[in-house]
Curated annotation (Swiss-Prot):
Subunit text: Homomultimer. Interacts with nucleoprotein and with the cytoplasmic domain of glycoprotein.
Note: Most abundant protein in the virion.
UniProt domain comment: Late-budding domains (L domains) are short sequence motifs essential for viral particle budding. They recruit proteins of the host ESCRT machinery (Endosomal Sorting Complex Required for Transport) or ESCRT-associated proteins. Matrix protein contains one L domain: a PPXY motif which potentially interacts with the WW domain 3 of NEDD4 E3 ubiquitin ligase (Potential).
Any one Gene Ontology BP term: viral budding via host ESCRT complex
Keyword Metal-binding set for record: no
Protein name: Matrix protein
GO cellular component: host cell endomembrane system; membrane; viral envelope; virion membrane
Gene3D superfamilies per the UniProt record, alphabetical: Rhabdovirus matrix protein M2 (3.10.460.20)
Sequence motif: PPXY motif, positions: 35-38
Length: 202
């Protein structure tokens, strides 16, 4: 039976020696969508809590036997239960993971590495989101292991509030990121002041 758990197991040097070839990147075993579009900031409306964050995100996938988009989605469906970071910023982390995994992976030994560096604008509904000046350094490994196959996700997200003008992230319903956000149950609501803006509730 497939199950998720946080494990000490990681992609160590001896595993790299055992499997010298990098696993294949995700194939088209599921819908492959283009990455989401960014919408330039023109005007922020309403009383939502607005924060500019300089983001550095990385997801390293360790899989000796290859991995698929379906497996990544399966792993992230239990994200709420295994997330070990600041709960006030879990929504931001979900957004970043979705955007990171929408990019192109770079092979690194037996691993595939997805990276993202952006300045993004996040809007939270009132009473939600991080405190003023709050920063995040989040690092966690989540694994999927059914005794026949092993896939490990090493996730790192760094977020600090900055004054560089960023971009709004938007939910493009045809994007791979949107599928991942749906799997992670990203909680949003439509802004009462702007029908094209989603506010984070977590």
């Amino acid at each position: 039976m497939n199950f998720l758990k946080k494990m000490i197991k990681s992609c160590k040097d001896e595993e790299t020696q055992k499997y010298p070839s990098a696993s294949a990147p995700p194939d088209d075993d599921d819908i492959w969508m283009p990455p989401p579009e960014y919408v330039p900031l023109t005007q922020v409306k309403g009383k939502a809590s607005v924060r500019n964050f300089c983001i550095s995100g990385e997801v390293k996938i360790c899989s000796p036997n290859g991995y698929s988009f379906k497996i990544l989605r399966h792993i992230l469906k239990s994200f709420d239960n295994v997330y070990s970071g600041n709960r006030r910023m879990i929504g931001l982390v979900k957004v970043v993971i979705g955007l990171v995994l929408s990019g192109s992976p770079v092979p690194e030994g037996m691993n595939w590495v997805y990276k993202l560096r952006r300045t993004l604008i996040f809007q939270w509904a009132e009473s939600h989101g991080p405190l003023e000046g709050e920063e995040l350094e989040y690092s966690q490994e989540i694994t999927w292991d059914d005794e026949a196959e092993f896939v490990g996700l090493q996730i790192r997200v760094s977020a600090r509030q900055c004054h560089i003008q960023g971009r709004l992230w938007c939910i493009n319903m045809n994007s791979r990121a949107c599928q991942l956000w749906a799997d992670m149950i990203l909680q949003t609501q439509q802004s009462p002041d702007d029908e094209n803006t989603s506010l984070l509730l977590e």
